[in-house]
Amino acid sequence: MTVLKDAVSTSLYGSRGSNGVVMITTKKGQQGRTQITADAKWGAVSREVANYDVIKNPGEYYEQLYKGYYNGYRYNSGFSATKSFQLANNDLSKTGYQIYTVPTGQYLVGKNGKLNPQATLGYTDGTNYFTPDAWEDATFKTTFRQEYNVGISGASDVFSYYSSFSYLQDDGTIKGSGFDRLTGRTNVEYKAKKWLTIGSNMAYTHTVSNSPLEQDENSTNSSSNAFFIANNIAPIYPMYVRDATGNIMYDKASGNKIYDYGDGESTGFARNWMSMSNPLGDLTYNKTEYNMDIFEGNWFAKADLTHGFTATVRLGLNTDNSIIYNYNNPLYGQSSSYGGEIMNEQTRTTALTHQYLLNYQNAFGKHNVSALAGFEGYRLKVTDFYGNGQQIYRMNDYMLGNSTSKFTAGGTKNEYHTAGYFFSGSYNYDETYFVNIGYRRDGTSAFAKNNRWGNFFNFGLGWNMKKESWLQDFEALDQLKLRTSFGQTGNDNHNYNLATTAGDDPYAGWYAYQDIFKMTGTDGVFSDGTLKNKGNADLKWEKTNAFDFGADYSFFKSRLYGSLDFFFRATSNLLDFKQVALINGYSKIPINMGTVQNYGVEFEINYDIIKNHDMQWSVNFNGTWTKNRIHKLSSDYENGQYITGNRIYKEGESIYNFYLPKYLGVNENGEALYLGVKMNKDPETGKDTTPVKDEEGNYIEEATTDYDNAYEYNRKESGDILPKVYGGLGTTFAWKGLDFAIQTSFQLGGRIYDQGYSDLMTTGGTSFSAGHNFHKDVLKAWSEDNTSSNIPRVDFTDKYATSFSDRFYTSSDYFSIDNITLGYTLPKSLLSRIGIQSLRFYGSIENVAIFSARKGMDPRMSLTYVSSSWYTARRTISGGIKLTF
């Protein structure tokens, strides 16, 4: 695999190279006898990143919950200590469950704020027994993974072949999230004539993915999200229904455990927080299965013409047929109220690429010349249809025909086309001086006719300084090559930016220049068409102008080698959307928002510490320093800035710039303080009216407990939150058949909004809900015994305690150990006697560990914020054997 990042290389690939190009070279047969390779590995999969550091002791949770109620009554309502004590204990019932047996006439929490020592964990109402379960331990498991690969290859003077077969089975880290994949590939080349070579590279993949719904960033706070619930549910709730003696009850029909959904149906208790929720129950009784059949075919014919010319025709076909079966059982959970639900969906994706190339290559003494001209067309079509029904007749039958009422159906067809003409030429003199030029004209169906075509240029220069006579005597230097390039690439694929904000249409970006309407009607009669997505016929190509200047070097007989690069990229006509007033009939419109610049330095250093016949030891280190800023905003934005939600886009500042109130800690009563502005008062009511201004017309700042004041009048910019530096460090070691490798990565100097932590620090306001867990940092909150804390007091009436502010900016620095591998290859002298070329045993750990600012927070998941709702990185420990003969 080769990553192309320089301006000339990426420009040649047009819009699909706008974010860099990854070249994957598939295996081909090597001349000689047939070679067979077999590789098998087995392993265990678990979570790399644990949950946040939450309260896990039921009594400790009740003490904090009591404190929230007590402080609310005592400080805000003005009740006496005795009255507040009584009311707070009564409010503990808002959790909906009783899991402690408390002596008659006594309270669960005493006047000292501690759990009643006479209370015993476990409670029965005569029908069921209630005791908390460890939801995290029950939800996440260490599971099995196995993978097998077999390849056969060979070649002669006119024919080469490579075929492979692989199978992967992975059970996932949560129940019902397993993955099976079966793949076959064949790569064949045949020299049909002295002047003609033809080839075929085909692959077929079949996958079955059990992918439970609502386990990603699009289902934050979902009652079915196992990650969110395991992170956030209080440690006081049963996961299972138990009989009066404490034994877990089982469903007679399926033999599965009966799960407590907290809805008052299975038992007499109902949760206040996330009622009708039990993700493990959903994962047990419900099912979402994705079946995919993927075909990839690439064919070519290459003709060697006269005088250094070659002509090549390439055809590529990718098809993806997927079927989704979504089954929500009729007995338990949210679908039980309407007898269960089934959804079947089938999607067919077809991508066709055709390419025609004319290449010229020749040498005239020390002058080397090459040129390439070509045309490329690309067509993508996606068709899908779905059906949905309720009232399931048979359990565990996932087909739509098993539903008996409330049928709905729909379908869509979407197409996207591009075409491109391109030319590139290169010249070098004696492999010393290099010149590259190129041009590409791309067209797309994503824009209106008058904006569909874009022109993109590139050029590059190179100088192999080691070839100069005045460096020949510098024996320590093996290579020193300077290079610089400028290239333009276009981007029309704003599907992500637009579609993810346009509702439920994943293809909105393909038609962003058009107004899209949704038809409505009943019983076959059309009634109306409503605007679904507002288009913009003035949209045009997003264009990136990239400049690179760098050097490749090698010293000491290639023991020390690497590269150093400076890059500058300016992306103009950036494709995005603009929020508008709903009075227009729509909330957003796609636009070319302006110009964004990215610049920085990146380097790579490799050093062979030991390099001889028996032992090799090398280290590698790479890093990138980068900066981002908005150079110019579209005239659609007034005053050179645009505010949307908690983000601000402003000329001269980073595109990753938050706009939030500044948190100042707490006041003398433990209330959250923010930097707001001084307000004029109504003389009659005493209520705030308008901000007070100084002589220059600026607001006068002051600390306030009124979050709305700070949010409306005095939000502050965060500045660039992106990491300043990121990179990796690794080492490899080999000695007499033994090999060892370790690879790590890091990032420094950035910030991220820790939404997962914020959720767990909620101790008041509308977000405060009995049954929602707390982070252990809540134990450090302000109290009369801890007045130095900057964490607001636990108080259910403090509605501003965890509002959006810079309080929850957290360092996004991390260091991760990504991979450790240890292997041993048996000596060839031992294997040759039994006809084996190579035999290697190995073990590896992937995603070993990550060290970040807070337990449970993984800064790799996003550039802007992290949540407790996402399917986290997985650690895989495996061992295997690789055999070649």
Give the label of every model feature segment.
Residues M1-T37, R145-E147, S160, S166-L168:
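A beta-strand signature from Gram-negative outer-membrane beta-barrel systems
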Residues T37-Y123, E214, L498-A499, D505, ...:
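Conserved small-residue
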Residues K94, Q98-S153, V158-S166, R242-F300, ...:
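Outer-membrane beta-barrel transmembrane strand signature
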Residues Y123, S335, S405, T444, ...:
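Extracytoplasmic gating/loop element in the C-terminal half of outer-membrane beta-barrel translocons
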Residues T142, T173-G176, S445-N450:
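Solvent-exposed loop/turn segments connecting transmembrane beta-strands
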Residues R181, N187-L196, N201-H206, Q215, ...:
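Extracellular/periplasmic, surface-exposed regions of secreted and cell-surface proteins
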Residues N218-T220, N225-F227, L331-E341, T520-L531, ...:
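Solvent-exposed loop segments that connect transmembrane elements
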Residues M593-Q597, N639-F658, S718-G728, L760-K776, ...:
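C-terminal extracellular loops and terminal segments
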